[in-house]
Amino acid sequence: MNSLFASTARGLEELLKSELEALGAHDCKIVQGGVHFQGDDRLMYQSLLWSRLASRILLPLNEFKVYSDLDLYLGVQAIDWPSIFGVDKTFAVHFSGVNDEIRNSQYGALKVKDAIVDSFTRKMDQRPTVAKQQPDIRVNVFLQRDMASVALDLSGEGLHQRGYRDLTGQAPLKENLAAAIIQRSGWQPGTPMVDPMCGSGTLLIEAAMMASDRAPGLHRGHWGFTAWSAFNEALWRELTTEAQVRARRGLLETSSRFFGSDIDRRVIEMARANARRAGVAELITFNANDISKLVNPLPEGPVGTVISNPPYGERLESEPALIALHNMFGRMMKTAFGGWRLSLFSASPELLSCLQLRADREFKAKNGPLDCVQKNYQLTANPQGAGGALVAEDYANRLRKNVKKLDKWAKQQGIECYRLYDADLPDYNVAVDRYGSKVVVQEYAPPKTIDPQKARQRLFDVINATLAVLELPSNQLVLKTRERQKGKNQYEKLAQKGEFLLVSEYNAKLWVNLTDYLDTGLFLDHRIARQMLGKMSQGKDFLNLFAYTGTASVHAGLGGARSTTTVDMSRTYLEWAEKNLRVNGLTGQQHRLIQADCLSWLSNTDEQFDVIFIDPPTFSNSKRMETTFDVQRDHLVLMKELKRLLRRKGTIMFSNNKRGFQMDLAGIAALGLEAKEITALTQSEDFARNRQIHNCWLVTHSQEEK
């Protein structure tokens, strides 16, 4: 009787135990990551050949205490290695774990290798060769605290490597995990199965192998036991011959049929090739189709199971498309697959909620480092495809109301970019902005007290509802998360797409970029201020400080300004400003662009201007100041410098975004200036709920100064 250990992915131990017991294993004991069991040689080889769930089958050789590297060396050398494999065989060591003395797995593996080689040298005066690729013998050592376990890895390569999958698409499932997903799905051999997002076909192939009674190890070309001195070749040949007979008979007798599709034709060809190598190609029909064209391949029956591992996305920009995909998929399941079972495996439970289906079973498992969930559903017939209650219904109703009001208003105003929703409801803390045909949803980062998964679920509900209310294709929605920006973060790229969209604002054309930066290049709340600047600038010299993408300069130029001077420290934004000026025909020497720290430039120039627009940051570091710039603390210093540049009858428009900003009117007067707040005049209909989004002032020379 052999003592053996079968390893598996975390979360699959109970399934593996049942499988081993069905094969005839005794004394099965579950531990994290695997199952200890007992069995004779026949059972040992059967587990290697037939286990669909095990990652490896290990034969323990020794277990001992390790308090030093010498203990490790001596414990390994105590094993009679020449009796286990011949000196003409190659070997490799896999070492995992550390303790206070063995702090590096590579060092541990080196000590084990030395002990094995020295054992051969001492007894035979010869040494075996170490091979990293396909060694004849694989030694597995696991160190936990002060206990080391040494085992012979009978698998060789991991058992998930069945031998049929030479080619895969992106993010493939391991074969043993795919087998577990199928077993947990409720699918029964003899019934049909559909995978509408099948990739390279792993789920379908594994199910077809189960249905046709094909041993998962039948196609493997390399094992870890064939160079083992105790290898029973006759018994192994008997078991593999028996497995081949069962596979041929099973292929003829099974009534199961399998259907797979994927949008990628190249991946579908891989899936077909994999199925041929696995010997189950005649059971599976593959098609290259977009999921939107999914139909039930057996509309008249029998009913079966839809099993899939849909894409889940790791990048924020992909989420709207994935949310729309899952929402559409849920509707398809109800319309075309009534009476069937559905089982989906995903790293994103939030995306599964977008199906708007109620799961009746749920399992957890690991897919490599990812925590995943598998949910099973019973699909009820619904030929009309009613979608059920709209998620985030309160949000959807508010958005619908705002859209009806604001779309009409924006058309009358002659603007394409405006805010549709601005955290109107506390449970849905997002801003929704329309930019021509596209929409940007910005999530305000939730407080740390809010459960991240709950916040993510709520955001997904918002996106789902936004797409539905606006009847918007998912590729027209851009998702961003807005957090407080520090230092230069606001200038750093979020993406590298370089996609610009030309939009209209009154008589101006402006370039926006919805993906690459946190902001889009157009501050919507300053729209009326820009319009006012255009009217104020006719025949005037206009200065734009902290100019960003120069949109105020565009309006001033179109308003007939004699000259515009646009100053910003960012080369990126100045190049953007130049594009904005050029598309409006504002070219020539009278339209200057200056890259400089605005505060330093301000203190070093003596030019004169009629209209000055300044929208400084609330807080920043400045080379000119030894400490920092704070708009509340330092606005008088700023005004003193601006006064120098302002012609006698000139006007400064001063704006900032600091909530609760208090203008020092007495200090302004002492400088010989007058300030008048015009915040209410610069706030538009789409920002009516957020009166504190900015404050705005007109500053002129006092009557005495004039």
Swiss-Prot record:
Broad class of where this protein is predominantly found:
cytoplasm
A Pfam family the protein falls into: RlmL_1st
- Give the EC number(s) under which this enzyme is classified: 2.1.1.173, 2.1.1.264
Sequence intervals crossing the membrane:
none
Catalysed reactions, semicolon-separated: guanosine(2445) in 23S rRNA + S-adenosyl-L-methionine = N(2)-methylguanosine(2445) in 23S rRNA + S-adenosyl-L-homocysteine + H(+); guanosine(2069) in 23S rRNA + S-adenosyl-L-methionine = N(2)-methylguanosine(2069) in 23S rRNA + S-adenosyl-L-homocysteine + H(+)
List cellular component terms (GO). Answer: cytoplasm
Give an example GO molecular function. Answer: 23S rRNA (guanine(2445)-N(2))-methyltransferase activity
Enumerate the subcellular locations listed in this protein's record, separating them with semicolons.
Cytoplasm
| Keywords of the record | Cytoplasm, Methyltransferase, RNA-binding, rRNA processing, S-adenosyl-L-methionine, Transferase
Which residues does the UniProt record annotate as the domain THUMP? Answer: 43-154
Q: Kindly indicate whether the keyword DNA-binding belongs to this entry.
A: no
Supply the HAMAP family for this chain: 23SrRNA_methyltr_KL
Q: Which family does it belong to?
A: Belongs to the methyltransferase superfamily. RlmKL family.
Protein function: Specifically methylates the guanine in position 2445 (m2G2445) and the guanine in position 2069 (m7G2069) of 23S rRNA.
Q: Which NCBIfam families match?
A: PRK11783.1
Q: What is this protein called?
A: Ribosomal RNA large subunit methyltransferase K/L
Protein's organism: Yersinia pseudotuberculosis serotype IB (strain PB1/+)
Taxonomic path: Bacteria, Pseudomonadati, Pseudomonadota, Gammaproteobacteria, Enterobacterales
